[in-house]
Amino acid sequence: AVEEAHLPGRVEHRLVAIGLDGSRQLLASGADFYHSPQVSDDGTQLAWIEWDRPDLSWTRTRLMRATLAADGSVAQVQSVGGADDAWQQPRFDRAGQLCCLSDRSGYWVPWQVAADGPRKLLAIAADHAPAPWQQGSNTWLPLEDGWMALSWSEAGYGHLALRHSVSAEERRLAHAYSRFRHLCSDGKALYCIGASPSCTAAILRIELATGELTRLLGEDSALDAADLSRPERLLYLSAGGESAHGFFYPPRNHAQQLDQPPPLLIFTHGGPTSACYPVLDNRIQFWTQRGFAV
């Protein structure tokens, strides 16, 4: 666990192990921040992310690895990532090999951290995670036999697939959904929270062997399909010739016919903290139902 200690005149972050009896054991200290501790399946390795001020979690971090003894103590602590790279979501595969997302190639994509240095795994040139603002992100998973479960974003839309790290064979999943979070697997199925233009959030189960999708929890919008405004990707030039991105929602109400251009509401955000996603937002539907474009 990541522990935050409020001490006289300062706040200190540390990595600790907490026993079932409530006992606490210090694992790592000295860095300004700690993130995403991960234990290998056999319990013999520990990985985590750490960094110091003035760096941020998406500008420059250290990927750390250590061995775990039977009593929970750590040894052979070493930094295994590049000195000027940013890392997030460390994971151990079934063979105990450390893998992690890094943006050293320009996008957040998975890398395998071998003894001779990091090696990029085959993945689409797109961000497979947002900026790591919070603990607990889980947007990718190493699976059996070189397969990975990956979610990524292209042109604002989220995608989900199984992809082989060597052959690049790919199986797209859950086509109707446009945002995916909190991936996990029991070895037979992939579970996640998915959202779509007609569904705010749903717990999904996807069979790894067949891709069959079952929605375990969550419902579509109660709006009639003719009244549901769906996002349309928008790209326009901003100050300095830069491209700006957005989503346009036209007014939708089968009981109303507009004979003139609708009033337009514009919502801006400072992303990526409060980025906009192409998923059902009832606040937007409130306005499009009443003749507004958003």
Regions found by a protein language model. Give the residues of each.
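Short loop/turn segments that connect beta-strands within beta-propeller blades
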Residues: 19-22, 68-72, 114-117, 164-168, ...
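Surface-exposed loop and turn segments in beta-propeller and other repeat-based domains
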Residues: 78, 119-133, 219-231
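Serine-hydrolase catalytic core recognition
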Residues: 91, 184-189, 193-294
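A flexible loop/linker signature enriched in serine peptidases of the S9 family
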Residues: 2-14, 28-34, 49-64, 79-88, ...
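Residue-level detector of Asp-centered blade-edge/turn motifs that repeat once per structural unit
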Residues: 41-42, 93-95, 142-145, 185-187
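Hydrophobic beta-strand positions that form the internal "hydrophobic ladder"
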Residues: 46, 98-99, 148, 190
